[in-house]
Protein backbone atom coordinates (compact mmCIF):
# COMPACT_ATOMS: atom_id res chain seq x y z
CA UNK A 1 0.00 0.00 0.00
CA UNK A 2 1.06 3.63 -0.44
CA UNK A 3 3.34 4.79 2.35
CA UNK A 4 2.30 8.18 3.71
CA UNK A 5 1.81 10.07 6.91
CA UNK A 6 -1.71 8.64 7.05
CA UNK A 7 -0.20 5.14 6.98
CA UNK A 8 2.12 6.20 9.79
CA UNK A 9 -0.92 7.26 11.82
CA UNK A 10 -2.91 4.13 11.03
CA UNK A 11 -0.16 1.64 11.94
CA UNK A 12 0.76 3.36 15.19
CA UNK A 13 -2.84 4.10 16.13
CA UNK A 14 -2.26 7.81 16.35
CA UNK A 15 -5.03 10.25 15.70
CA UNK A 16 -4.27 12.12 12.49
CA UNK A 17 -4.89 15.42 14.22
CA UNK A 18 -2.07 14.60 16.65
CA UNK A 19 0.48 14.86 13.82
CA UNK A 20 1.29 18.52 13.12
CA UNK A 21 0.67 19.54 9.55
CA UNK A 22 4.26 20.63 8.99
CA UNK A 23 5.55 17.19 10.11
CA UNK A 24 3.40 15.07 7.82
CA UNK A 25 5.41 15.46 4.62
CA UNK A 26 8.65 14.88 6.51
CA UNK A 27 7.31 11.70 8.11
CA UNK A 28 6.10 10.55 4.73
CA UNK A 29 9.52 11.13 3.22
CA UNK A 30 11.23 9.21 6.01
CA UNK A 31 8.83 6.30 5.70
CA UNK A 32 9.26 6.18 1.96
CA UNK A 33 12.82 5.03 2.62
CA UNK A 34 12.40 3.16 5.91
CA UNK A 35 8.90 1.70 6.19
CA UNK A 36 9.07 -1.55 4.15
CA UNK A 37 12.11 -2.74 6.09
CA UNK A 38 11.19 -1.11 9.38
CA UNK A 39 7.92 -2.95 9.98
CA UNK A 40 9.50 -6.36 9.27
CA UNK A 41 11.93 -6.13 12.18
CA UNK A 42 10.74 -8.72 14.80
CA UNK A 43 11.33 -6.50 17.82
CA UNK A 44 9.28 -3.76 16.22
CA UNK A 45 6.43 -6.14 15.49
CA UNK A 46 6.52 -7.42 19.08
CA UNK A 47 6.07 -3.98 20.61
CA UNK A 48 3.22 -2.92 18.34
CA UNK A 49 0.53 -4.07 20.85
CA UNK A 50 2.17 -1.96 23.55
CA UNK A 51 2.31 0.95 21.21
CA UNK A 52 -1.37 0.60 20.33
CA UNK A 53 -2.28 0.76 24.01
CA UNK A 54 0.00 3.60 24.95
CA UNK A 55 -0.14 6.79 22.93
CA UNK A 56 2.78 8.46 24.80
CA UNK A 57 5.00 5.43 24.18
CA UNK A 58 3.85 5.40 20.60
CA UNK A 59 4.72 9.03 20.05
CA UNK A 60 8.09 8.60 21.78
CA UNK A 61 8.92 5.62 19.59
CA UNK A 62 7.75 7.40 16.46
CA UNK A 63 9.86 10.43 17.33
CA UNK A 64 12.94 8.27 17.86
CA UNK A 65 12.35 6.62 14.52
CA UNK A 66 11.80 9.95 12.84
CA UNK A 67 15.01 11.50 14.17
CA UNK A 68 16.99 8.35 13.31
CA UNK A 69 15.93 8.88 9.73
CA UNK A 70 16.95 12.51 9.95
CA UNK A 71 20.37 11.67 11.36
CA UNK A 72 20.97 9.15 8.60
CA UNK A 73 20.42 11.93 6.08
CA UNK A 74 17.61 10.02 4.41
CA UNK A 75 14.76 12.29 5.39
CA UNK A 76 16.14 15.78 4.98
CA UNK A 77 14.91 17.50 1.87
CA UNK A 78 16.58 20.88 1.52
CA UNK A 79 15.02 23.73 -0.35
CA UNK A 80 18.30 24.23 -2.20
CA UNK A 81 21.45 22.18 -2.64
CA UNK A 82 24.40 24.15 -4.00
CA UNK A 83 27.24 22.19 -5.55
CA UNK A 84 30.35 24.08 -6.47
CA UNK A 85 33.80 25.45 -5.79
CA UNK A 86 33.37 29.00 -7.07
CA UNK A 87 32.89 32.38 -5.43
CA UNK A 88 29.38 32.17 -6.85
CA UNK A 89 28.71 29.07 -4.75
CA UNK A 90 29.57 31.00 -1.59
CA UNK A 91 27.34 33.91 -2.58
CA UNK A 92 24.48 31.56 -3.50
CA UNK A 93 24.67 29.86 -0.11
CA UNK A 94 24.67 33.18 1.73
CA UNK A 95 21.74 34.44 -0.35
CA UNK A 96 19.67 31.31 0.23
CA UNK A 97 20.28 31.40 3.96
CA UNK A 98 19.32 35.06 4.20
CA UNK A 99 16.15 34.28 2.27
CA UNK A 100 15.13 31.79 4.93
CA UNK A 101 15.65 28.74 2.75
CA UNK A 102 17.01 25.45 4.02
CA UNK A 103 20.26 25.15 2.12
CA UNK A 104 23.41 23.08 2.13
CA UNK A 105 26.56 23.89 0.20
CA UNK A 106 28.55 20.92 -1.07
CA UNK A 107 32.03 22.25 -1.80
CA UNK A 108 34.44 20.00 -3.77
CA UNK A 109 37.40 21.93 -2.30
CA UNK A 110 38.62 22.51 1.24
CA UNK A 111 38.06 26.28 1.28
CA UNK A 112 35.37 28.84 0.39
CA UNK A 113 35.57 31.50 -2.30
CA UNK A 114 36.94 29.84 -5.41
CA UNK A 115 39.45 31.91 -7.34
CA UNK A 116 38.66 34.99 -5.23
CA UNK A 117 40.38 33.14 -2.37
CA UNK A 118 42.94 31.30 -4.49
CA UNK A 119 45.09 33.91 -6.16
CA UNK A 120 42.84 35.97 -8.42
CA UNK A 121 43.54 39.12 -6.47
CA UNK A 122 43.43 41.53 -9.40
CA UNK A 123 39.70 41.56 -10.11
CA UNK A 124 38.80 42.14 -13.74
CA UNK A 125 35.92 44.55 -14.10
CA UNK A 126 37.71 47.43 -15.86
CA UNK A 127 36.90 49.79 -13.03
CA UNK A 128 33.17 49.38 -13.74
CA UNK A 129 32.29 48.98 -10.07
CA UNK A 130 28.77 50.21 -10.82
CA UNK A 131 27.93 47.09 -12.84
CA UNK A 132 27.16 44.82 -9.89
CA UNK A 133 25.39 45.10 -6.56
CA UNK A 134 23.90 42.68 -4.07
CA UNK A 135 26.15 40.32 -2.14
CA UNK A 136 28.95 40.70 -4.69
CA UNK A 137 29.10 44.38 -3.83
CA UNK A 138 29.09 43.53 -0.12
CA UNK A 139 32.07 41.24 -0.66
CA UNK A 140 34.16 43.89 -2.40
CA UNK A 141 33.10 46.52 0.14
CA UNK A 142 34.26 44.20 2.92
CA UNK A 143 37.56 43.68 1.11
CA UNK A 144 38.07 47.45 0.94
CA UNK A 145 37.13 47.83 4.60
CA UNK A 146 39.72 45.22 5.55
CA UNK A 147 42.33 47.60 4.15
CA UNK A 148 40.71 50.69 5.64
CA UNK A 149 39.77 51.90 2.19
CA UNK A 150 36.53 52.81 0.44
CA UNK A 151 37.48 51.09 -2.80
CA UNK A 152 40.10 48.57 -3.85
CA UNK A 153 40.36 46.54 -7.03
CA UNK A 154 43.12 44.15 -5.97
CA UNK A 155 43.55 42.22 -2.74
CA UNK A 156 45.57 39.47 -1.11
CA UNK A 157 44.15 35.93 -1.37
CA UNK A 158 44.15 35.56 2.42
CA UNK A 159 41.90 38.62 2.73
CA UNK A 160 39.45 37.23 0.19
CA UNK A 161 39.39 34.00 2.20
CA UNK A 162 38.87 35.79 5.51
CA UNK A 163 35.99 37.87 4.14
CA UNK A 164 34.20 34.87 2.69
CA UNK A 165 34.66 32.87 5.89
CA UNK A 166 33.16 35.69 7.93
CA UNK A 167 30.21 36.21 5.57
CA UNK A 168 29.46 32.48 5.58
CA UNK A 169 29.67 32.27 9.37
CA UNK A 170 27.44 35.31 9.91
CA UNK A 171 24.84 33.90 7.54
CA UNK A 172 24.98 30.51 9.27
CA UNK A 173 25.63 28.56 6.08
CA UNK A 174 26.05 24.80 6.37
CA UNK A 175 29.05 23.79 4.26
CA UNK A 176 30.36 20.30 3.59
CA UNK A 177 33.90 20.52 2.26
CA UNK A 178 35.73 18.02 0.04
CA UNK A 179 32.42 16.64 -1.20
CA UNK A 180 32.78 15.47 -4.81
CA UNK A 181 29.90 14.43 -7.04
CA UNK A 182 29.90 10.75 -8.02
CA UNK A 183 30.29 11.07 -11.78
CA UNK A 184 29.73 7.37 -12.46
CA UNK A 185 26.99 7.28 -15.13
CA UNK A 186 23.62 6.68 -13.51
CA UNK A 187 24.88 7.04 -9.94
CA UNK A 188 25.56 10.69 -9.19
CA UNK A 189 22.26 12.22 -10.21
CA UNK A 190 18.84 10.67 -9.66
CA UNK A 191 16.16 12.17 -11.88
CA UNK A 192 12.42 12.05 -11.31
CA UNK A 193 11.02 12.97 -14.69
CA UNK A 194 12.62 16.28 -15.61
CA UNK A 195 13.67 17.14 -12.08
CA UNK A 196 16.71 16.20 -10.06
CA UNK A 197 15.51 14.28 -7.02
CA UNK A 198 18.86 13.70 -5.36
CA UNK A 199 22.60 13.73 -5.94
CA UNK A 200 25.11 11.24 -4.55
CA UNK A 201 28.70 12.00 -3.72
CA UNK A 202 31.89 9.94 -3.78
CA UNK A 203 31.58 9.87 0.02
CA UNK A 204 28.42 7.81 -0.43
CA UNK A 205 26.21 10.53 0.99
CA UNK A 206 23.02 11.44 -0.84
CA UNK A 207 21.44 14.89 -0.77
CA UNK A 208 17.88 15.71 -1.74
CA UNK A 209 16.41 19.11 -2.57
CA UNK A 210 13.68 20.95 -4.38
CA UNK A 211 16.21 23.06 -6.28
CA UNK A 212 19.83 22.51 -7.28
CA UNK A 213 22.46 25.05 -8.27
CA UNK A 214 25.60 23.96 -10.10
CA UNK A 215 28.03 26.69 -9.11
CA UNK A 216 31.14 24.76 -10.11
CA UNK A 217 33.74 26.04 -12.55
CA UNK A 218 33.44 22.86 -14.65
CA UNK A 219 29.68 22.11 -14.71
CA UNK A 220 29.83 18.48 -13.55
CA UNK A 221 26.33 18.49 -12.04
CA UNK A 222 24.83 20.24 -15.03
CA UNK A 223 26.36 17.67 -17.36
CA UNK A 224 25.30 14.71 -15.21
CA UNK A 225 21.71 15.98 -15.23
CA UNK A 226 21.59 15.53 -19.00
CA UNK A 227 21.57 19.23 -19.83
CA UNK A 228 22.82 20.25 -23.28
CA UNK A 229 26.28 21.79 -23.20
CA UNK A 230 29.32 22.37 -25.36
CA UNK A 231 33.09 22.56 -24.98
CA UNK A 232 35.37 24.52 -27.27
CA UNK A 233 34.94 27.25 -29.85
CA UNK A 234 32.02 27.73 -32.21
CA UNK A 235 32.78 28.40 -35.86
CA UNK A 236 32.34 31.98 -36.99
CA UNK A 237 29.16 31.20 -38.93
CA UNK A 238 27.30 29.54 -36.03
CA UNK A 239 26.31 32.82 -34.37
CA UNK A 240 27.78 35.19 -36.97
CA UNK A 241 30.54 36.37 -34.62
CA UNK A 242 33.60 37.85 -36.30
CA UNK A 243 35.77 36.95 -33.28
CA UNK A 244 34.70 33.31 -33.10
CA UNK A 245 36.68 30.15 -33.70
CA UNK A 246 40.32 30.02 -34.70
CA UNK A 247 42.12 33.39 -34.57
CA UNK A 248 45.65 33.33 -35.92
CA UNK A 249 48.16 35.69 -34.35
CA UNK A 250 49.88 36.27 -37.67
CA UNK A 251 46.72 37.75 -39.20
CA UNK A 252 47.04 41.51 -39.56
CA UNK A 253 45.26 43.74 -38.99
CA UNK A 254 43.93 41.74 -36.04
CA UNK A 255 40.30 42.85 -35.95
CA UNK A 256 39.71 40.33 -33.16
CA UNK A 257 42.40 41.86 -30.96
CA UNK A 258 42.82 45.53 -30.08
CA UNK A 259 46.00 45.50 -27.94
CA UNK A 260 48.57 45.57 -30.75
CA UNK A 261 51.23 42.84 -30.32
CA UNK A 262 50.63 42.06 -26.65
CA UNK A 263 50.30 38.28 -26.11
CA UNK A 264 51.80 37.48 -29.52
CA UNK A 265 55.21 36.64 -30.92
CA UNK A 266 56.95 39.72 -32.28
CA UNK A 267 60.13 37.92 -33.39
CA UNK A 268 60.73 34.91 -35.60
CA UNK A 269 61.24 31.90 -33.34
CA UNK A 270 62.13 28.43 -34.60
CA UNK A 271 59.66 25.80 -33.27
CA UNK A 272 61.74 22.66 -33.89
CA UNK A 273 63.77 20.74 -31.31
CA UNK A 274 66.83 21.16 -33.50
CA UNK A 275 66.51 24.61 -35.08
CA UNK A 276 65.99 24.46 -38.82
CA UNK A 277 65.32 20.71 -38.82
CA UNK A 278 61.60 19.79 -38.94
CA UNK A 279 62.56 16.11 -38.83
CA UNK A 280 63.78 16.60 -35.24
CA UNK A 281 60.21 17.20 -34.11
CA UNK A 282 58.41 20.11 -32.54
CA UNK A 283 59.10 21.64 -29.16
CA UNK A 284 56.56 20.72 -26.43
CA UNK A 285 53.07 22.17 -26.81
CA UNK A 286 53.59 23.49 -30.35
CA UNK A 287 51.32 22.18 -33.09
CA UNK A 288 51.58 22.00 -36.86
CA UNK A 289 48.02 22.22 -38.20
CA UNK A 290 47.26 22.01 -41.87
CA UNK A 291 44.86 24.56 -43.35
CA UNK A 292 44.44 26.46 -40.09
CA UNK A 293 41.95 29.16 -41.03
CA UNK A 294 40.36 31.98 -39.04
CA UNK A 295 36.78 31.22 -38.07
CA UNK A 296 37.08 27.44 -37.84
CA UNK A 297 35.44 25.84 -34.82
CA UNK A 298 37.04 23.18 -32.62
CA UNK A 299 36.89 21.58 -29.17
CA UNK A 300 39.84 23.49 -27.75
CA UNK A 301 39.68 25.99 -24.88
CA UNK A 302 41.77 28.91 -23.72
CA UNK A 303 44.77 28.24 -21.50
CA UNK A 304 44.79 27.80 -17.72
CA UNK A 305 47.41 28.83 -15.19
CA UNK A 306 47.81 29.33 -11.46
CA UNK A 307 47.44 32.91 -10.28
CA UNK A 308 50.45 32.85 -8.00
CA UNK A 309 50.79 35.44 -5.27
CA UNK A 310 54.44 36.49 -5.12
CA UNK A 311 56.23 38.81 -2.73
CA UNK A 312 59.47 40.77 -2.49
CA UNK A 313 59.26 40.99 1.32
CA UNK A 314 62.32 39.13 2.71
CA UNK A 315 60.35 38.21 5.84
CA UNK A 316 57.69 36.43 3.78
CA UNK A 317 59.79 35.27 0.84
CA UNK A 318 59.77 31.54 -0.07
CA UNK A 319 62.49 31.06 -2.71
CA UNK A 320 61.54 29.78 -6.16
CA UNK A 321 63.45 26.54 -6.69
CA UNK A 322 63.79 24.17 -9.62
CA UNK A 323 60.76 21.86 -9.36
CA UNK A 324 60.92 18.10 -9.37
CA UNK A 325 60.37 16.91 -12.93
CA UNK A 326 61.84 20.07 -14.46
CA UNK A 327 62.70 19.76 -18.15
CA UNK A 328 64.44 22.68 -19.82
CA UNK A 329 62.94 21.65 -23.15
CA UNK A 330 59.52 22.66 -21.76
CA UNK A 331 60.87 26.23 -21.58
CA UNK A 332 62.94 26.23 -24.76
CA UNK A 333 60.33 28.30 -26.60
CA UNK A 334 60.58 30.97 -23.89
CA UNK A 335 64.37 31.00 -24.05
CA UNK A 336 64.50 31.15 -27.84
CA UNK A 337 62.02 34.00 -27.81
CA UNK A 338 64.39 35.99 -25.59
CA UNK A 339 67.34 35.08 -27.80
CA UNK A 340 65.39 36.22 -30.87
CA UNK A 341 65.19 39.69 -29.33
CA UNK A 342 61.86 39.83 -27.48
CA UNK A 343 62.96 41.54 -24.28
CA UNK A 344 59.50 42.03 -22.76
CA UNK A 345 58.94 40.68 -19.23
CA UNK A 346 56.56 37.76 -19.95
CA UNK A 347 54.19 38.50 -17.09
CA UNK A 348 51.37 40.79 -16.06
CA UNK A 349 52.52 41.79 -12.58
CA UNK A 350 49.71 43.52 -10.68
CA UNK A 351 50.37 44.99 -7.22
CA UNK A 352 47.99 43.88 -4.48
CA UNK A 353 46.60 46.02 -1.70
CA UNK A 354 48.35 45.77 1.64
CA UNK A 355 52.02 46.26 2.41
CA UNK A 356 52.92 46.82 -1.24
CA UNK A 357 55.25 43.82 -1.46
CA UNK A 358 52.81 41.33 -3.00
CA UNK A 359 51.71 40.91 -6.59
CA UNK A 360 49.28 38.82 -8.62
CA UNK A 361 51.53 37.24 -11.26
CA UNK A 362 49.58 36.52 -14.44
CA UNK A 363 50.39 35.50 -17.99
CA UNK A 364 51.37 38.03 -20.66
CA UNK A 365 53.08 38.22 -24.06
CA UNK A 366 54.26 35.41 -26.32
CA UNK A 367 55.22 32.75 -23.75
CA UNK A 368 54.20 33.18 -20.12
CA UNK A 369 52.71 31.24 -17.23
CA UNK A 370 49.82 29.88 -19.31
CA UNK A 371 50.33 26.27 -20.41
CA UNK A 372 48.54 26.57 -23.75
CA UNK A 373 47.24 23.22 -24.95
CA UNK A 374 47.74 21.54 -21.59
CA UNK A 375 44.12 21.80 -20.51
CA UNK A 376 42.01 20.71 -23.48
CA UNK A 377 40.91 17.48 -21.81
CA UNK A 378 40.20 19.07 -18.43
CA UNK A 379 36.44 19.79 -18.70
CA UNK A 380 35.46 16.17 -19.38
CA UNK A 381 38.37 14.47 -17.59
CA UNK A 382 38.03 12.17 -14.59
CA UNK A 383 38.98 13.55 -11.18
CA UNK A 384 42.25 11.62 -11.36
CA UNK A 385 43.09 13.00 -14.80
CA UNK A 386 42.26 16.53 -13.65
CA UNK A 387 44.73 16.18 -10.78
CA UNK A 388 47.38 15.10 -13.31
CA UNK A 389 46.64 18.13 -15.48
CA UNK A 390 46.81 20.42 -12.46
CA UNK A 391 50.14 18.93 -11.42
CA UNK A 392 51.52 19.38 -14.94
CA UNK A 393 50.52 23.05 -14.82
CA UNK A 394 52.10 23.49 -11.40
CA UNK A 395 55.36 21.90 -12.55
CA UNK A 396 55.38 24.04 -15.68
CA UNK A 397 54.72 27.32 -13.83
CA UNK A 398 57.22 26.61 -11.05
CA UNK A 399 59.72 25.77 -13.78
CA UNK A 400 58.84 28.92 -15.70
CA UNK A 401 59.43 31.10 -12.62
CA UNK A 402 62.71 29.34 -11.82
CA UNK A 403 63.87 29.65 -15.43
CA UNK A 404 63.17 33.39 -15.45
CA UNK A 405 65.16 33.95 -12.28
CA UNK A 406 68.01 31.49 -12.81
CA UNK A 407 68.71 30.55 -16.43
CA UNK A 408 71.66 32.48 -17.94
CA UNK A 409 69.89 32.53 -21.33
CA UNK A 410 67.31 34.90 -19.85
CA UNK A 411 68.21 38.60 -20.33
CA UNK A 412 69.93 39.93 -17.22
CA UNK A 413 67.39 42.68 -16.54
CA UNK A 414 64.51 40.21 -16.58
CA UNK A 415 66.44 37.64 -14.55
CA UNK A 416 67.30 40.27 -11.95
CA UNK A 417 63.69 41.43 -11.64
CA UNK A 418 62.25 37.91 -11.48
CA UNK A 419 64.75 36.81 -8.83
CA UNK A 420 63.33 39.36 -6.38
CA UNK A 421 60.07 37.44 -6.12
CA UNK A 422 59.15 34.39 -4.10
CA UNK A 423 56.02 32.70 -2.85
CA UNK A 424 54.53 34.28 0.26
CA UNK A 425 54.66 32.47 3.62
CA UNK A 426 51.39 33.98 4.80
CA UNK A 427 49.38 32.83 1.79
CA UNK A 428 48.11 29.26 1.31
CA UNK A 429 49.96 28.36 4.49
CA UNK A 430 48.94 24.70 4.33
CA UNK A 431 50.23 24.42 0.75
CA UNK A 432 53.67 26.00 0.90
CA UNK A 433 52.44 29.32 -0.49
CA UNK A 434 51.11 27.71 -3.68
CA UNK A 435 47.47 28.46 -4.70
CA UNK A 436 44.96 25.72 -3.95
CA UNK A 437 43.09 26.03 -7.21
CA UNK A 438 44.06 26.10 -10.87
CA UNK A 439 42.54 29.01 -12.78
CA UNK A 440 39.81 27.38 -14.89
CA UNK A 441 39.16 30.15 -17.36
CA UNK A 442 36.74 28.07 -19.42
CA UNK A 443 35.25 24.58 -19.29
CA UNK A 444 31.77 23.39 -20.20
CA UNK A 445 29.21 25.93 -21.36
CA UNK A 446 25.49 25.19 -21.20
CA UNK A 447 23.47 25.58 -24.40
CA UNK A 448 20.06 26.94 -23.48
CA UNK A 449 17.16 28.73 -25.15
CA UNK A 450 19.16 31.97 -24.98
CA UNK A 451 22.85 31.79 -25.85
CA UNK A 452 24.74 34.95 -24.98
CA UNK A 453 26.90 35.96 -27.94
CA UNK A 454 29.22 38.68 -29.18
CA UNK A 455 26.09 40.53 -30.34
CA UNK A 456 24.88 40.89 -26.74
CA UNK A 457 28.29 42.12 -25.61
CA UNK A 458 28.45 44.72 -28.36
CA UNK A 459 24.90 45.99 -27.80
CA UNK A 460 23.59 44.73 -31.13
CA UNK A 461 21.11 42.55 -29.24
CA UNK A 462 19.68 43.06 -25.77
CA UNK A 463 18.27 40.35 -23.52
CA UNK A 464 14.75 41.27 -22.36
CA UNK A 465 15.21 39.37 -19.09
CA UNK A 466 18.52 40.49 -17.54
CA UNK A 467 19.62 39.09 -14.18
CA UNK A 468 22.99 40.83 -14.10
CA UNK A 469 25.45 42.80 -16.20
CA UNK A 470 28.66 41.97 -18.01
CA UNK A 471 31.25 44.58 -18.92
CA UNK A 472 34.74 43.09 -19.28
CA UNK A 473 36.43 42.73 -22.63
CA UNK A 474 35.68 39.73 -24.82
CA UNK A 475 38.86 38.01 -23.80
CA UNK A 476 40.51 34.70 -24.57
CA UNK A 477 44.04 33.78 -23.66
CA UNK A 478 46.12 31.76 -26.09
CA UNK A 479 44.53 28.46 -27.12
CA UNK A 480 47.59 26.99 -28.82
CA UNK A 481 51.06 27.70 -30.17
CA UNK A 482 51.23 26.75 -33.85
CA UNK A 483 53.71 26.68 -36.71
CA UNK A 484 53.10 29.23 -39.43
CA UNK A 485 53.55 28.47 -43.10
CA UNK A 486 56.89 30.28 -42.91
CA UNK A 487 58.05 27.82 -40.25
CA UNK A 488 57.90 30.01 -37.15
CA UNK A 489 56.05 29.85 -33.83
CA UNK A 490 52.95 31.98 -33.32
CA UNK A 491 50.01 32.15 -30.93
CA UNK A 492 46.43 31.33 -31.86
CA UNK A 493 43.13 32.01 -30.14
CA UNK A 494 44.00 35.28 -28.40
CA UNK A 495 41.10 37.73 -28.65
CA UNK A 496 40.30 41.05 -26.98
CA UNK A 497 37.69 43.69 -27.66
CA UNK A 498 35.96 45.82 -25.02
CA UNK A 499 32.14 46.14 -25.13
CA UNK A 500 31.01 49.72 -25.73
CA UNK A 501 28.99 49.64 -22.50
CA UNK A 502 27.78 47.13 -19.89
CA UNK A 503 25.19 44.69 -21.23
CA UNK A 504 22.40 42.58 -19.76
CA UNK A 505 22.79 38.85 -19.15
CA UNK A 506 19.65 36.83 -19.87
CA UNK A 507 17.88 34.82 -17.18
CA UNK A 508 17.51 32.05 -19.75
CA UNK A 509 21.29 31.80 -20.01
CA UNK A 510 21.53 30.41 -16.45
CA UNK A 511 18.77 27.78 -16.77
CA UNK A 512 18.48 24.73 -19.03
CA UNK A 513 16.41 24.97 -22.17
CA UNK A 514 12.69 24.27 -21.89
CA UNK A 515 12.08 20.53 -21.92
CA UNK A 516 15.28 19.76 -20.01
CA UNK A 517 15.96 19.78 -16.26
CA UNK A 518 13.33 21.86 -14.45
CA UNK A 519 14.98 22.47 -11.07
CA UNK A 520 18.58 23.29 -11.92
CA UNK A 521 20.53 26.53 -12.34
CA UNK A 522 23.98 26.88 -13.91
CA UNK A 523 25.22 30.42 -13.15
CA UNK A 524 28.91 29.66 -13.73
CA UNK A 525 28.90 27.37 -16.79
CA UNK A 526 26.16 29.51 -18.30
CA UNK A 527 24.80 29.50 -21.84
CA UNK A 528 27.20 31.59 -23.90
CA UNK A 529 29.38 31.34 -26.95
CA UNK A 530 33.13 31.14 -26.48
CA UNK A 531 33.40 34.82 -27.42
CA UNK A 532 30.73 36.08 -25.02
CA UNK A 533 31.94 33.77 -22.28
CA UNK A 534 35.32 35.51 -22.47
CA UNK A 535 33.64 38.70 -21.29
CA UNK A 536 31.23 37.16 -18.79
CA UNK A 537 33.67 34.84 -16.99
CA UNK A 538 34.59 37.31 -14.25
CA UNK A 539 34.26 36.72 -10.52
CA UNK A 540 31.81 39.60 -9.86
CA UNK A 541 29.57 38.26 -12.64
CA UNK A 542 29.71 34.72 -11.22
CA UNK A 543 28.64 36.10 -7.83
CA UNK A 544 25.87 38.19 -9.34
CA UNK A 545 24.38 35.40 -11.44
CA UNK A 546 24.56 32.96 -8.53
CA UNK A 547 22.60 35.29 -6.26
CA UNK A 548 20.05 35.83 -9.02
CA UNK A 549 19.76 32.06 -9.41
CA UNK A 550 18.90 31.67 -5.73
CA UNK A 551 16.25 34.39 -5.90
CA UNK A 552 14.72 32.74 -8.97
CA UNK A 553 14.82 29.36 -7.24
CA UNK A 554 12.85 30.82 -4.36
CA UNK A 555 10.19 32.11 -6.73
CA UNK A 556 9.98 28.75 -8.48
CA UNK A 557 9.45 26.99 -5.15
CA UNK A 558 6.94 29.52 -3.88
CA UNK A 559 4.89 29.32 -7.09
CA UNK A 560 5.49 25.58 -7.58
CA UNK A 561 6.78 26.11 -11.12
CA UNK A 562 9.76 24.97 -13.12
CA UNK A 563 12.76 27.26 -13.42
CA UNK A 564 11.77 27.80 -17.05
CA UNK A 565 8.33 29.12 -16.03
CA UNK A 566 9.42 31.69 -13.46
CA UNK A 567 7.65 34.99 -14.11
CA UNK A 568 10.36 37.46 -15.05
CA UNK A 569 8.53 40.58 -13.86
CA UNK A 570 8.16 39.05 -10.40
CA UNK A 571 11.80 37.99 -10.50
CA UNK A 572 12.94 41.44 -11.59
CA UNK A 573 11.22 43.03 -8.60
CA UNK A 574 12.94 40.66 -6.19
CA UNK A 575 16.31 41.18 -7.87
CA UNK A 576 16.00 44.94 -7.54
CA UNK A 577 14.95 44.52 -3.91
CA UNK A 578 18.21 42.60 -3.44
CA UNK A 579 20.09 45.56 -4.97
CA UNK A 580 21.09 43.69 -8.08
CA UNK A 581 22.07 45.90 -11.02
CA UNK A 582 20.10 45.06 -14.16
CA UNK A 583 20.85 47.99 -16.45
CA UNK A 584 23.77 50.25 -17.18
CA UNK A 585 24.10 53.12 -14.74
CA UNK A 586 26.27 56.25 -14.83
CA UNK A 587 29.38 56.15 -12.68
CA UNK A 588 29.00 57.75 -9.27
CA UNK A 589 30.75 61.09 -9.03
Stretches found by the model and what they are:
Residues 76-86:
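Beta1/beta-strand and adjacent pyrophosphate-binding region of the FAD-binding site
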Residues 71-75:
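Boundary at the C-terminal end of the N-terminal hydrophobic targeting segment
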Residues 45-59:
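Bacterial N-terminal signal peptides that target proteins for export
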Residues 187-206:
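Conserved beta-strand-loop-beta-strand element in the redox core of flavoprotein oxidoreductases
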Residues 205-211, 215-589:
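Flavin (FAD/FMN)-binding glycine-rich loop and adjacent Rossmann-like elements that form
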Residues 58-68:
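Bacterial N-terminal signal peptides
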